[in-house]
Amino acid sequence: MPKKKGFTPLPYLASIVFLPWWVSLSFNKSLEPWVTNWWNTRQSETFLNDIQERNVLERFIELEELFLLDEMLKENPETRMKNLRIGIHNETIQLVKTDNEYHLHTILHFSTNIICFAILSVYSILGNEELVILNSWVQEFLYNLSDTIKAFSILLVTDLWIGFHSPHGWELMIGSVYNDFGLAHNEQIISGLVSTFPVILDTIVKYWIFHYLNRVSPSLVVIYHSMND
């Protein structure tokens, strides 16, 4: 395949990886004051789903019980109720501030995710020729590797993503995606995804090895199975 004159894959690949992150970070910093001002001046209603509302209520009850216990241990009963009301009021304000920060974090991260997706979409449309050339560079690089290195790389990647220790990594990654999109942490859903994704990927990898590698490079499959055993 003819390569574009003067095209080098590494700078282009670096731009694909780092430019969306840099632009989204810049937008995040520039949008933060505006979003904060809009939320504080025009937001008259708090939007909470059932899980978030239950978490906020549980945190408030826990703080109220701890503060009440602290006041009961004090020796002066005359100022106990006054301090209790003041303390609960202050804790309520703190919970509201924490909730506002959570919603601002959700809005900003959701906006930056959309910006990253838009930038990558523009890259795929306008830089289609560069992507084709980059793909040819990658294929040429992989073709020049020995079968042993290829088998070792496949085994390493599959063990990282679908191996015995992969569920913890999947849990962290899915939790990070949940936080980025402002979704409430739900152990049941995350556990279901963690137990499902590795199985699906394992099936896809086995099908790819059986259907593609057996036809293209039987020796690579033999080396892979020898390492895996």
From Swiss-Prot:
GO biological process, one term: potassium ion transport
Single GO MF descriptor: proton transmembrane transporter activity
Reaction catalyzed: K(+)(in) + H(+)(out) = K(+)(out) + H(+)(in)
Keywords on record: Antiport, Chloroplast, Hydrogen ion transport, Ion transport, Membrane, Plastid, Plastid inner membrane, Potassium, Potassium transport, Transmembrane, Transmembrane helix, Transport
InterPro entries found in the cross-reference section: CemA
A Pfam family: CemA
GO CC terms: chloroplast inner membrane
Membrane-crossing residue ranges in chain numbering: 7-27, 114-134, 154-174, 189-209
Coiled coil ranges: none
Function: Contributes to K(+)/H(+) antiport activity by supporting proton efflux to control proton extrusion and homeostasis in chloroplasts in a light-dependent manner to modulate photosynthesis. Prevents excessive induction of non-photochemical quenching (NPQ) under continuous-light conditions. Indirectly promotes efficient inorganic carbon uptake into chloroplasts.
Family stated for the protein in its record: Belongs to the CemA family.
Family matches, as HAMAP family: CemA_PxcA (MF_01308)
Family matches, as PANTHER family: CHLOROPLAST ENVELOPE MEMBRANE PROTEIN, CHLOROPLAST ENVELOPE MEMBRANE PROTEIN-RELATED
Protein name (Swiss-Prot/TrEMBL): Potassium/proton antiporter CemA
Species of provenance: Acorus calamus var. americanus (American sweet flag)
Lineage of the species this protein comes from: Eukaryota, Viridiplantae, Streptophyta, Embryophyta, Tracheophyta
